[in-house]
Amino acid sequence: MDETVTSEPRVLDGMYTFVVGIDADESRALAQAETIADMPLEADAVRVILLHSFEGKTKGSTVEQVKPVRLARERLEEAGMTVEAEGYGGDAARAILNVADDHDADQLVLAGRKRTPTGKVLFGSVTQSVILDTERPVLVCSADEE
């Protein structure tokens, strides 16, 4: 059976919500944003929640001060998507899962890293925890790293 693959934007019934865990790495944040922006979806039907978890959050810190969050937001807004940013203190995996529940996310988008051959067996601890503790689809993106 021949199947035709189309790159026409998929029309969604209502909003499609992504929760994106953004760490401190700019290239990974941009890779995550590019991956979402390049999906064949109607941009005006996509909502993206960018989440950065502060370790030991300091008083007065805001998520908008985090450069990877700003870069991802700019790229997604250029693509015409609705973007929100949230910051939380504490455990990143737990924050991602809680925000996904709060917003009834359709999909989670996390950053992956290149690893040694032994390290490739396991994802990073945050990514692994999220994958194991959610029933939502999880997309793991990686930046081109040298």
Language-model features, listed with the residues they occupy:
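Short, conserved glycine- and acidic-residue-centered signature motifs
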Residues: A29, Q65, F123-T127
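Charged, low-complexity cytosolic intrinsically disordered regulatory segments
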Residues: T6-P9, S53-L108, G119, E146
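Hydrophobic anchor at the start of a short beta-strand
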Residues: V46-V48, V83-A85, V138
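Gly/Ser-rich helix-loop-strand patches that form or flank binding pockets
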Residues: M1-V5, Q107-E146
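Small/aliphatic-rich secondary-structure junction motif
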Residues: E8-G60
